[in-house]
Amino acid sequence: THLSARVGLIAADDRAGSFYSNPSTAVLCKNRDSVWIFYFPEYGKDVHCGMKSEHLVGTSIPRFTFDTPTTPGNDFYKLCEGEHPLVMIFLPAFDHPVTREYLTRYLQTLPRLRGVRLACVVRSSPRMVAKATQGAEFPFTLICDAPGVLYGYLGVEQARGILSWSFTAQRIYKAAKEQGYRYNSNAPQQLPLTLVVGHMGKILFTHSGRSQTDLPEDCAAIREITREVVRTMAEDQRRAHPHCSDETLTLPDLVGWGDLDGSSN
């Protein structure tokens, strides 16, 4: 059984963290809450605990096992081995209003995710999520990290009060409050983190949210971000090897991502 396209608010237990960055280079796109920026340093560095976002691209997340609401002990590197790019979005607890809002958006727009795989990370236990969803399966991967191990490893921090707010966040909280949700507006809040990840956990792109809602607004936005990452990687490869034939396979071709590096919709 798959979830319906509306994720209900179950409780008000928000184990929050956040992540911020000093991104650089070219602007990718804009929406009402954010400006998306590419950062592509040289590849091959090892990642260390507590690294800032400007050092994440080109590093590899170590191999680990994770639990989903229905399946324990999944291999992260196996998840990375798929023939399509993997986008990871770090959210607050499953029952947090922002998490509920964006999971709902992703469920509603899932058909527009063609050629991309999605994994959302929530700071809730598998048991809590399974209870809230009555054991229903998500149509994309939901990684449960209640202790915040991944958040901590990637250097996730917190933003307080108005620094983490946006107009969209205000609307989300207003609607949640009308449904009985209570929160401390001055408490630390987690800011989202969006990654595009390749094989062996290599981080190809990172965007650290400047507000609670500075993340892809739906599956169409997720796909467009990933297409730009693939295009940029292919262009970088062509610049690095200018004497190669046009028939030489690009990195997206080699990993089966060619369907994103074109004009198809």
Language model features by range: what are they?
Residues 1-14:
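Extreme N-terminal basic, low-complexity initiation segments
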Residues 13-14, 22, 30-33, 42-46:
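Intrinsically disordered, low-complexity polyampholyte segments enriched for Lys and acidic residues
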Residues 40-85, 132, 183-265:
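Non-globular targeting/processing and membrane-anchoring segments
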Residues 79-106:
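Short active-site neighborhood of thiol/selenol oxidoreductases, capturing the structured segment around
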Residues 100-153:
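Structural microenvironment flanking redox-active thiols in thiol-disulfide oxidoreductases
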Residues 145-214:
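Thiol/selenol-based redox catalytic cores and closely related redox-interacting motifs
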